[in-house]
A protein has these predicted regions:
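Conserved active-site regions of diverse hydrolases
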Residues: 1-293
Length: 293
């Protein structure tokens, strides 16, 4: 089933292109900085590598565009959509109500914030309190997105961050190659997403928020977490060593470097998000059903 609905992506992850493909998009949706003319009617990509829910997340890497700033950028897009529809605000609202919004945040709030005690004071907060801090901010941001006209919003949960190659290298993994304390901290955030969806749907008339349970897609990936390239242990830790050759068979590797899944991993994520293979994959429904909501 192809919905061919406009697709707005506010996120930090990269695999949602394949979700857009399943929804009937024929090409990449343009990044916000390059969006122009009527191509904005098919969707806009606001994602920024390293960004997060909290505005300070990832700042040690340089300039990143936080979720707060992405919302500001989306509001600018809405003004341009209205202009493309001859100033008709009702048509604009109708258009936005039909759009699919993908919100995938939180990973960097751990990788590029909470798990970096030398750079961010949040590391001193107990895991449950930090998770609630993220949820409180996320609730405000997603409510703003609703107030801008969004009605169909898929919220992606976090995968087992304690199993990514860089985390396993920098800490003491278990026999499966995963750092249990990290996964437990991340699960505190994931556990709050279903109640968040219930709360948002109850408080916002006409809203269709749904939760995509990414952690259910790959419950045990630690034993497979060898990266495709040799990763740096110094500056740029976790990234591929410059000029090093990647593995010849990338389709057999779930991770390209110390952090990022390969295309194979992203295709798996998109497929399960679009059509759930288990009742635990999505709540209350997968993206295919969200499209027809």
């Amino acid at each position: 089933m192809y919905s061919k609905l406009p697709f707005y992506r506010l996120a930090e992850l990269t695999g949602t292109y394949f979700t857009g493909e399943l929804l009937g998009l024929r090409d990449f949706i343009p990044p916000f900085a390059a969006s122009e003319g009527r191509n904005i009617m098919d969707g806009v990509n606001y994602a920024s590598g390293g960004c997060g829910i909290l505005p300070e997340t990832g700042r040690h890497q340089g300039e990143v565009i936080s979720f707060d700033q992405q919302l500001i950028n989306h509001n600018r897009t809405i003004s341009r959509v209205t202009a493309a529809l001859s100033g008709d605000k009702k048509k604009t609202a109708d258009h936005l109500n039909k759009c699919i919004y993908i919100a995938g945040f939180g990973s960097n709030d751990y990788i590029n914030n909470y798990l970096m005690p030398n750079l961010y004071p949040n590391s001193k907060i107990p895991p449950d309190q930090y998770a609630q801090k993220l949820i409180n901010k996320y609730t405000q941001q997603l409510s703003t997105l609703y107030n801008y006209g969004a009605r169909k919003i898929a919220i992606f949960g976090l995968g087992p961050i304690g199993c990514i190659p860089q985390e396993a290298l920098s800490s003491r993994p278990n026999l499966l190659g995963c750092v249990e304390n990290t996964n437990k901290a991340v699960q505190q955030f994931n556990n709050r997403l279903k109640p968040l969806v219930d709360d948002l749907n109850a408080k916002h008339p006409g809203a269709h928020f749904t939760y995509i349970n990414v952690s259910n897609f790959a419950p045990v990936i630690g034993v497979l977490n060898k990266p495709c390239c040799k990763i740096s242990e110094g500056a740029g830790a976790g990234q591929c060593v410059p000029n090093s050759a990647p593995c010849p068979f990338r389709s057999f590797k779930p991770f390209f470097d110390g952090f990022h899944p390969t295309e194979t991993g992203h295709i798996l994520l998109a497929g399960r998000a679009y059509v759930s293979a288990s009742p635990a994959d999505a709540y209350p429904y997968d993206i295919r059903h969200l499209a027809s909501a």
